[in-house]
């Protein structure tokens, strides 16, 4: 995750060995909180993957909390996060704050069943994968890329159908165009398990 260092607060902690300064995200990582903020890119995905692997090494039996505020982005980068979430031993609880769109929504749905949350004013959007950038070249190359895109679309729909507890036909229909949902609508659809009004409403 990339942030402007001038905008990231620093937390000072006192211990028997004196003072220690943490940027706020490193401090929250100690609480097993991982953030995905902004577009899903190779860089942001690598940082998330590294943090997930680190937290597993610290304690393989304790949940990890994955906070998502993302408009989506690269499918391959997102799938590296998805595969790591499934690869590691700890349960990964997901929470949407702000928005989870496209690959962000896919990752939100991929949290541990019963531990997928959204704050009440979050927006969730699902759709079919897009080709990033202009696609040019020979007709045969364009055909190859089109076939690959259809394979990716089918795979994402199958996986999301599994996570949402829905038929594949539902996902094929509902991702045909941009499909925006409120937190409550995302819960009804099966993308999340609970809308959190406040911390006291959390049920695990």
UniProtKB/Swiss-Prot annotation:
Keywords: Cytoplasm, Hydrolase, Protease, Serine protease
Reaction catalysed by this enzyme: Hydrolysis of proteins to small peptides in the presence of ATP and magnesium. alpha-casein is the usual test substrate. In the absence of ATP, only oligopeptides shorter than five residues are hydrolyzed (such as succinyl-Leu-Tyr-|-NHMec, and Leu-Tyr-Leu-|-Tyr-Trp, in which cleavage of the -Tyr-|-Leu- and -Tyr-|-Trp bonds also occurs)
Location(s) in or outside the cell: Cytoplasm
BP term (GO), one: protein quality control for misfolded or incompletely synthesized proteins
Superkingdom of this protein's organism: Bacteria
Active site as annotated: 102, 127
EC number of this enzyme: 3.4.21.92
Gene Ontology cellular-component terms listed: cytoplasm; endopeptidase Clp complex
Alphabetized Pfam families for the sequence: CLP_protease
Disulfide bonds: none
Family label: Belongs to the peptidase S14 family.
Subunit structure: Fourteen ClpP subunits assemble into 2 heptameric rings which stack back to back to give a disk-like structure with a central cavity, resembling the structure of eukaryotic proteasomes.
Family matches, as NCBIfam families: clpP, PRK00277.1, PRK12553.1
Main function: Cleaves peptides in various proteins in a process that requires ATP hydrolysis. Has a chymotrypsin-like activity. Plays a major role in the degradation of misfolded proteins.
PANTHER family linked to this entry: ATP-DEPENDENT CLP PROTEASE PROTEOLYTIC SUBUNIT
Protein name, entry field: ATP-dependent Clp protease proteolytic subunit
């Amino acid at each position: 995750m990339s942030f402007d260092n001038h905008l990231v607060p620093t937390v000072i902690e006192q211990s028997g060995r004196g003072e220690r300064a943490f940027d706020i995200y490193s401090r929250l990582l100690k609480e097993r909180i991982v953030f995905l903020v902004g577009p899903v890119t190779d860089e942001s995905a690598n940082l998330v993957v590294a943090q997930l692997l680190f937290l597993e090494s610290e304690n393989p039996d304790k949940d990890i909390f994955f906070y998502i505020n993302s408009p989506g982005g690269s499918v391959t980068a997102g799938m590296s996060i998805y595969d790591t979430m499934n690869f590691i031993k700890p349960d990964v609880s997901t929470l949407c704050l702000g928005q989870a769109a496209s690959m962000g929504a896919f990752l939100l749905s991929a949290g541990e069943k019963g531990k997928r949350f959204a704050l009440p004013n979050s927006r969730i959007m699902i759709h079919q994968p897009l080709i990033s950038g202009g696609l040019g070249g020979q007709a045969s190359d364009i055909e190859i890329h089109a076939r690959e895109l259809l394979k990716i679309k089918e795979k994402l729909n199958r996986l999301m159908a599994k996570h949402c507890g829905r038929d594949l036909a539902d996902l094929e229909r509902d991702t045909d165009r941009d499909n925006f949902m409120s937190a409550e609508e995302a819960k009804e659809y099966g993308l999340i398990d609970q809308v959190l009004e406040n911390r006291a409403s959390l049920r695990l």
